Amino acid sequence: MYKINRSALVPYSAQQMYELVNDVDSYRDFLPWCGGSRTIEKTDDSSVASVDIAFKGVHKTFTTSNRLAPGESIHMAMVDGPFSALEGRWSFKELDENACKICLDLDFAFSNRVVGAVIGPVFKIIADSMLDSFVKRAEELYAK
């Protein structure tokens, strides 16, 4: 199983960062590896979303079920995709009204060795760079 743990301190509120990460339908606008993204179902405290990976010749879709705690966290669990396991958590800790700590923790494993050999290196690059992509997007949207 692969584990990714990343965090960053940003000059934006926890609510702003939560809204950015929770806006799955906009992912293709700023994530370079995203071929498409869509929210399938959404309530105040949950969602189901699919993301298409299109990177370095790899084209795969994965779907997650997400528990939402607005302004605080998003817990992700795999519904479908090339993984035997995928769990993750985005957390947003308010430091003051204009700053927060954002954390991404991902645990994933692939459905078989062949899939892991093909997709593993690509998904690791994607997962490693994901937090940076959201921080960059926040700068574009929220910088004054």
Each model region followed by its residue ranges:
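Hydrophobic ligand-binding cavity/cleft-lining segments
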Residues: 1-45, 144
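Hydrophobic pocket/interface hotspot
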Residues: 17, 27, 49, 66, ...
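Beta-strand/loop substructures that line and gate deep hydrophobic ligand-binding cavities in soluble
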Residues: 78-128
